Amino acid sequence: MRLFRLELKRILKSRRTLILLAIALLLSVAMAYLPISFEGINRPNEDGTVTELDGLAAIKYKQDLYKTSAGEVTPDRIKSALETYQSCVREYGPVEEEGFPLAVFIEKIVPFRHLLMGLSEAFADPLTGIGADLMDIDPNDIDGAYYEKCAEHLQDVMRNEQRENETAQQKALEKYSELDTPFYLHSGISKDAFDYIELYILFLAILCVAIAAPTFAGEYQTGGDSILRTTKYGHKQLAITKILAAFTLFVVTFLVGITVHILILDAAFGTDCLKTSFQMRYSIINLPNINLGQLQIILAAAGLLSVLATVSCMLFLSAKCKDTLTVLLISIVVLLMPLFAYVAMGAT
């Protein structure tokens, strides 16, 4: 235990380590602020003027608007929202055009638009998968059959993408039937907030790799590796101690950083929106039976495992390579390789 404390103290005495840890915590705050700053909305005033709201002011204003649509996503509510949308479009023209009255948009469209997000997808063309225009959907087709329509769309997608794999098609439908319905919606938090959680985890992994790179390779450069090979408490015991000290530091750093990051986001966007079903924020045919709050936990847990896996790979390289720079470069390539592979596979 004393050896463990001394090793941890040795790591923390490094100015380079302290700077990188400070950067990790600063990034936690800065990257949580970015999706908050991206929020914006125009608020019509009684005198006919328009006020541009950004950041927390925009979030607060949107929260007040979204309260009317919060609750279970029932077919009746979706039908009512669609009828309101179609009525407004017939009277004022397409919502996307500049001529659409801002006051009408804020009062009748914004509060309920997230209820309609999955509707176009659910009524998509069964062959092409192209979403239906909301104006082409008959509100009467939604009565009591909305979730059946979602399941039909999933069946169409699986038939198109897994044509040769009937087992996968059946498994997807079985998994979808296990979802808790009706879905729940409390709009507020944006997709950007979750994207930045993932991006922060990536940066955190890079910083942890930079901190841990000299763990063994640095000893080779200074000649300190002779202690590992010749002393009474060297060999396996000292190596394990160095690894445990590094892991402890990274786990604590990750937990503090990701906790601060998520707390800032939840304080800004509110915790009510975390009850929203995963399907109402992403695709209506997503299979995970979770809400956005659980998604945050899953991202954090998966992120921690990813960081520890990356650091484990880096420690192995640090033990094999003779200089820190080589370890650092190879580790970063390994860390970013899944991103490059994803882009390459997506392109093909």
Predicted segment positions?
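Aromatic- and glycine-rich beta-strand/loop motifs that create alpha-glucan
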Residues: 1-18
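Central hydrophobic cores of alpha-helical transmembrane segments
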Residues: 24, 325-338
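Secretory targeting signals
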Residues: 25-89, 94, 138-219, 240-323
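Residues that define the loop-to-transmembrane-helix transition and helix capping
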Residues: 15-18, 236, 324-325
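Hydrophobic transmembrane alpha-helix segments characteristic of membrane transport
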Residues: 219-226
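Short helix-to-coil transition segments within interhelical loops
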Residues: 229-235
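Aromatic-anchored segments of alpha-helical transmembrane domains
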Residues: 28-32, 333-343
